[in-house]
A protein has these predicted regions:
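Outer-membrane beta-barrel proteins
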Residues: 1-274
């Protein structure tokens, strides 16, 4: 009987020691936003006021080999939004896995236009048609930067096939400029998939940043392709105040759909924690 007790205590102690190797900090942050939105007289607006809140739990820990583990879990309006676990290997790159679309690949760079607020199509309550988003369920990502060139890729095995994408970004070809191009495949059904492509360019000088981005989604169904053209310019008035103007135009190949044009101004002011 005494031997059994000793064995049990030894096993418990061993498990406790092993768990401390992955201990790290856990931080909680949140945001709260109140928005007023007005639309043209030809559209039904309802209540123009709305609010949104987010809570994010983030943790990190260092491994014995110098690598770092990062974890994030986000709730939006009290509902699960995204989660991600990432292994930062330094110069070798970052491997990530989670239920979030913007961790790597074409979804992370679906809208690269500078803005003081949200994307112009989001601020005016337009659709995200033409935005190259693969979705984020159980996605494996990898991203590495070397000599000013960043390679970002994503892979997700779904029931009907494989969602995958790759993006290449160049930040040092021209001083102040950034260029990127990416492509991906989104499986829709056993006989249908979307081929996506996006390309963008941004240039910054002093407090001004301007950009343009072209995206296309080639659908399997005939006459169903979607093209998006976006451009914006932002100006940092000072450390607290920024303003921007952007446009987003969506063209549908299907004649029964009406092309969508969005434009808008955004402004943000930071004061302390607000």
């Amino acid at each position: 009987m005494n031997n059994l007790k000793k064995l049990g205590l030894t096993a418990l102690a061993g498990s406790l020691v092993a768990s401390t190797a992955f201990a790290g900090s856990l931080d909680v942050t949140g945001t709260a936003k109140v928005k007023y939105q007005s639309k043209g007289s030809e559209r039904v607006t309802g209540n123009p006021w709305s609010d949104a809140t987010t809570i994010t739990f983030s943790g990190s820990g260092d491994l014995d080999n110098g690598m770092t583990i990062n974890y994030g879990y986000t709730m939006a309006n009290a509902v699960f939004s995204s989660s991600k676990l990432a292994l930062d290997m330094g110069d070798t790159g970052v491997i990530s896995f989670g239920n979030v679309s913007h961790q790597a690949g074409i979804s992370k760079y679906s809208d690269m236009m500078p803005t003081a607020g949200e994307q112009v199509w989001d601020d005016v309550d337009a659709t995200d048609e033409g935005v190259t988003d693969l979705g984020g369920d159980n996605t494996l990502g990898y991203e590495m930067t070397m000599s000013g060139i960043t390679i970002s890729a994503s892979y997700a095995r779904v029931g009907l096939g494989t969602d995958n994408s790759v993006v290449i970004i160049a930040d040092e070809l021209v001083d102040g400029a950034s260029f990127g191009i990416g492509s991906g495949t989104n499986v829709i059904s056993a006989t249908s998939e979307d081929d996506m492509m996006t390309a963008w360019a941004k240039y910054s000088t002093g407090p001004i940043t301007a950009g343009i981005q072209l995206s296309t989604i080639d659908k399997t169904a005939a006459n169903s392709d979607v093209d998006r053209e976006a451009a914006s310019i932002s100006f940092a008035v000072n450390e607290q105040l920024s303003v921007s103007y952007g446009i987003s135009n969506v063209e549908y190949e299907l004649s029964t759909k009406t092309d969508e044009e969005s434009s808008g101004f955004s402004a943000s002011y930071t004061m302390g924690s607000m």
